[in-house]
């Protein structure tokens, strides 16, 4: 079997990095980098219209719950084909935007940087598609002492298939790495 490399597509964007509070001078809290993966949706069974703001995602909130600070080191949206993708191709519109953008899943292709991807069919039947987050166009801090309004948000739209399907053609997820620091002092819970 041939090893297939993911198709990596870079989103065109306007360089407009978010601003954040500068760290205090002197010694900083130790930090660690941890991986994460969030399942967004299966595609090809019904219409998908999704908005995932990383700073308020429940999976990431659980991962960062015992830390005061969390920032994105790297992140990507990934489209994985499933076993039915060669016979039932599906398309998905994707864009990374700051969370205070007025863009919505239905306006992805009217927004600068919006992309349409086809998963399945004769050309991309077994290809994984990677869509990296451009950290120079959003604020990478998803948890801090203050709330930021420009943290990353992924918009996704995939129409319902023309014929009813029971098995998804593809899956969409977000994965990457977070830098966590400034541990919160919490009580130790004991089991009863």
UniProtKB/Swiss-Prot annotation:
Record's signal peptide: none
Region annotation (Disordered) ranges: 1-30
Molecular functions per Gene Ontology: structural molecule activity
GO annotations of cellular component type: T=3 icosahedral viral capsid
Chief subcellular location: virion
Biased composition annotated in UniProt, kind: Polar residues: 12-30
Keyword terms of this UniProt record: Capsid protein, T=3 icosahedral capsid protein, Virion
Function: Self-assembles to form a T=3 icosahedral capsid composed of 180 copies of the capsid protein. The capsid encapsulates the single-stranded RNA genome.
Protein name, entry field: Capsid protein
């Amino acid at each position: 079997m041939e090893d297939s490399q993911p198709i990596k597509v870079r989103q065109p964007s306007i360089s407009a990095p978010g601003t954040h509070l500068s760290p205090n001078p002197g010694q900083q809290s130790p930090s660690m980098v941890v991986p994460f993966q969030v399942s967004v949706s299966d595609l090809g069974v019904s219409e998908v219209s999704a908005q995932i703001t990383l700073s308020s995602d429940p999976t990431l909130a659980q991962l960062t719950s015992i830390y005061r600070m969390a920032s994105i080191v790297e992140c990507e949206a990934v489209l994985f084909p499933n076993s039915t993708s060669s016979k039932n191709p599906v398309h998905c519109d994707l864009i990374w935007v700051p969370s205070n953008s007025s863009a919505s899943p239905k306006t992805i292709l009217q927004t600068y940087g919006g992309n349409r991807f086809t998963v399945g069919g004769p050309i991309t039947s077994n290809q994984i598609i990677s869509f990296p987050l451009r950290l120079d166009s959003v604020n990478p801090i998803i948890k801090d002492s203050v709330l930021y309004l420009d943290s990353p948000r992924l918009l996704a739209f995939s129409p319902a298939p023309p014929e009813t399907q029971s098995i998804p053609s593809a899956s969409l997820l977000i994965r990457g790495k977070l830098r966590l620091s400034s541990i919160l002092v919490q009580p130790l819970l004991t089991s009863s």
